[in-house]
Structures are given as C-alpha cells and as structure tokens.
UniProtKB/Swiss-Prot annotation:
Ranges of Basic and acidic residues composition bias in the record: 333-347, 360-374, 409-425
Taxonomic source organism: Equus caballus (Horse)
Identification of the protein by name: E3 ubiquitin-protein ligase Mdm2
Region (Interaction with PYHIN1 and necessary for interaction with RFFL and RNF34): 150-230
PTM summary: Phosphorylation on Ser-166 by SGK1 activates ubiquitination of p53/TP53. Phosphorylated at multiple sites near the RING domain by ATM upon DNA damage; this promotes its ubiquitination and degradation, preventing p53/TP53 degradation.
Length: 491
C-alpha cells in the first residue's frame, strides 16, 4: 500500500491536495496537549494513525457534548481543552482545511529512525481496532508495514514522488489474498467506529478527499469511504437534510393571462375616452351612522327611551333596543306644515292626473291650453265691454281703461298663484337625493336607478349607470351585481 508524504508548511496551512487518503495509515505522535486529550477518552498509546486521531477527537466531542444540538456540525470549544489545543472558540466539521491545519499543528510524524516503535504501534493499533485477529496475521502485517514505514519522512523532491508511484505499482501486484485481508482489516476499523460525531468528522473529511482526488488525480481510499457510508445511518442524513431547503414559487410575468397592463385599457377603450371624477363612499356595517366617535356629540345630547330606559344617540328617531319612536321627535308646527304640504301635494297630483303629462318630455300641454282659454275669455269680455262703452257713450274713457287694467292684473295674480302651488307640490314630491348631481360625473342629475333584486340605488345618471352595467361592475353603494338600469323621471 502506498504511503505518500505529508508536507507541512511553515504557517501550518495544509491544502487538501497535499493530504491524500492513504496518509490516514501514516503513524504520527501527538504533542503532549493533544495526547492528554486523546487519553481522556480511552487512548493508551503514544503513536496513532490519522484515523485513530480523528476517531478519538470525535469521541471527545461526543463525550463532552461540545456540538450544537440543532446544527451538529458546529463544535463549541471556547472553555474546553480542545479550544486551548486548536486556538479557536468554535469550528465546523465541514471546514476540512481548517481541521487539517489545527490537527497537524499538534502532530509529529514518526521518523525513519524509529521502525521498531512504529512497528509496535501498528501492532497495538491493529489489536485495539480488530480485537479478534490472531497472532499470525499480526506477524505478517508487521512484515508488510515495516518497509513502508521507512517512507514516512517528508520528501518534497520529485524523485521521492516517483518512488511513491513505483511503490504503488509494486503494491498493485500483490496477491488477492493479502489484498482481501487488508480490506478486511480496514472494514474492521470502520466497524469499530461508533455512530457518533466521529463518523460525521470522518465522513466530511472523506468527501473532501474524494473531491480533491478526482480533480488532481490523487489516489483515494475507497475502503474507508465504503465503511463510513455503510454505517453512517439516518443520523447523518438528517443533519445534512436540515441544512438544505428549497422554496418553490411562481413569478408573475407580464405575458400571463391573469395579469395584463392593457386589460383595463381595452375595457375603457370600448367607447370614447372620457375623464371621470368619482366620489367613493365607504358603506358601513349597518344603515345607521355611528356617533360614538363624533367629538361634537356629548352624553348630554343622548336621549333616554321611555320603554326600556336605553340611552340613544340624538339623531335616530327610534330606540336602538326596542325600536320605540322617540317622544316629541318633531315639533307640532312642522307637523302641521307637513300635513298642509301633503294636502297640497295630493291636490297637485289630482290636478295633474286630470290634466295629464306628455311623456317623456313631461310638458304640460293642457295647462297652456287652459291658460290660453282663460286669456281668450278675458279678451272677449274686455272687447265686449269696450264695444258697449263705445256704443253707449264716448265720454267715459277712464272707466273702460280701469276695467281693462283690473282684468289684466287678475290674470297675472292667478298665474303667479298657480305657479307657486305647482312648485310647492313638485318640491314635496321630489326625493332629496334627486336634487343632487350624479356621484360619478358630478354634472348630470341622478336619473339612472341601479336595480339589483327587489331594491335599487339612485346615485348616478342614466349614462354613467349604463356604463357600469356594460362593464359588469357592481353597484357602487352595496357591491351587489347590477341587473338592470331604469331611467327615472321626476314630475
């Protein structure tokens, strides 16, 4: 088996390409502080392989529970011997180069002058990890490992690298039995590892080794990778999965069917372009207004219901609890005036029914006819009176003139009274909202009733209401779908 060199730079930084996987079989001697740490978790030797060092470090981290519970690849060692050893308060198992650097600072490679010590350490290592191998295998293994231990000295020259390649080719010609026995021993090493943080450390290191060996052509150790991946279990998978997550969402594009900038423009371009001034009213939850937030209304303005003793705001005429009508809601004078107005309205309606209307212009043709007939009768009377006066006596012109003037004044007074009565009757029959202009255009009167179901809202002109219906817009007041638009006439 090839054991290439391990070169350590002056500043302690070691690249992953300089540390092939075969160096895990290289024997190293930990420094006193690291040796103390390893012996605290059961190590009993002076020389170890890289596998054993990493294994005991993982056991130490697991024993002291220095890892994070949620992110188990993070190790906190600020107040521990490991922090004094590495010189950092915390580190991550995924930072392979940093781990190599910190470990190699505390290791000394076994020199070529100590073959016996290295041989005994190898035998102790095998006995410790295998536990069930016989003495014959150990003797054969010592014979195999002794010549390879002479290659552990740092050889940065090109000739040493060529020698390592030649040794690799020689070892590739070994017998299948010996190769199988060595593979069996490496499997035993993997099986002896507990499913702890040591596995996580070795797995991360092996992943880095495999990626670096593929890029630089450095030989890797597939036996260690197979052993670790075989016994890693779900404990490592959950840790790796927890660090990875994905969020799926769809970005709205301007070309999608649901969103288009020209959609509203196409709807508005069905007719001529017009500019609208819209007044928006926000409908409340109930028909009555809320007076609780009005600063101008105090508790002294509230009235008490005589039926249920409920305190009610001043404006509603009924009680909010029992719906009893408020006493003395309107003064008596206004009530009488209202009765007189209603009587006048009834008289006006009866007169209008007798006379009739010209729909849709609402012109009163019969009224003008009656006026003309009255004027003609008065003219006939005047002419008759004048003729009689002329035939009787030409000496009384003043009396005839006074009669003419008096008849003309009577006609004017009659017309004034008639127009006043009609105006009063029309004002009493008009709804209050009809006087206000259209809410949308603020120019035309409110004559387009928006009908939905058995109710309707009169808040817009007929033209604006038709546009709302054509564009499938809801009622601006109650947001119900519009069924029809009714042109409303006021007398």
């Amino acid at each position: 088996m090839c054991n290439t060199n391990m070169s350590v730079s002056t500043d302690g930084a070691v690249s992953t390409s300089q540390i092939p996987a075969s160096e895990q079989e290289t024997l190293v001697r930990p420094k006193p502080l690291l040796l103390k740490l390893l012996k605290s978790v059961g190590a009993q030797k002076d020389t170890y392989t890289m596998k054993e060092v990493i294994f005991y470090l993982g056991q130490y981290i697991m024993t002291k529970r220095l890892y994070d519970e949620k992110q188990q690849h993070i190790v906190y060692c600020s107040n521990d011997l490991l922090g004094d050893l590495f010189g950092v308060p915390s580190f991550s198992v995924k930072e392979h180069r940093k781990i190599y650097t910190m470990i190699y600072r505390n290791l000394v490679v076994v020199s070529q002058q100590e073959p016996s010590d290295s041989g005994t350490s190898v035998s102790e290592n095998r006995c410790h990890l295998e536990g069930g191998s016989n003495q014959k295998d150990l003797v054969q293994e010592l014979q195999e490992e002794k010549p390879s231990s002479s290659d552990m000295v740092s050889r940065p020259s090109t000739s040493s690298r060529r020698r390592a390649v030649s040794e690799t080719e020689e070892n590739s010609d070994e017998l299948p039995g010996e190769r199988q026995r060595k593979r069996h021993k490496s499997d035993n090493i993997s099986l002896s590892f507990d499913e702890s943080l040591a596995l996580c450390v070795i797995r991360e290191i092996c992943c880095e080794r495999s990626s670096s060996s593929e890029s630089t052509g450095t030989p890797s150790n597939p036996d260690l990778d197979a052993g670790v991946s075989e016994h890693s279990g779900d404990w490592l998978d959950q840790d790796s999965v927890s660090d990875q997550f994905s969020v799926e969402f769809e970005v709205e594009s301007l070309d999608s069917e649901d969103y288009s900038l020209s959609e509203e423009g196409q709807e508005l371009s069905d007719e001529d372009d017009e500019v609208y001034r819209v007044t928006v009213y926000q409908a409340g939850e109930s028909d009555t207004d809320s007076f609780e937030e009005d600063p101008e209304i105090s508790l002294a303005d509230y009235w008490k219901c005589t039926s249920c003793n409920e305190m009610n705001p001043p404006l509603p005429p009924h009680c909010n609890r029992c719906w009893a009508l408020r006493e003395n809601w309107l003064p008596e004078d206004k009530g009488k005036d209202k009765g007189n107005m209603s009587e006048k309205a009834k008289l006006g309606d009866s007169m209008q029914e007798d006379e009739g209307f010209d729909v849709p212009d609402c012109k009163k043709s019969t009224v003008s006819d009656s006026r003309e007939s009255c004027v003609e009768e008065n003219d006939d009377k005047i002419t008759q009176a004048s003729l009689s006066q002329e035939s009787e006596d030409y000496s009384q012109p003043s009396t005839s003139n006074s009669i003419i003037y008096s008849s003309q004044e009577d006609v004017k007074e009659f017309e004034r009274e008639e127009t006043q009565d009609k105006e009063e009757s029309m004002e009493s029959s008009f709804p209050l909202n009809a006087i206000e202009p259209c809410v949308i255009c603020q120019g035309r009167p409110k004559n387009g009733c928006i009908v939905h179901g058995k109710t309707g809202h009169l808040m817009a002109c007929f033209t604006c209401a038709k546009k709302l219906k054509k564009r499938n817009k809801p009622c601006p007041v109650c947001r119900q779908p519009i069924q029809m638009i009714v042109l409303t006439y006021f007398p």
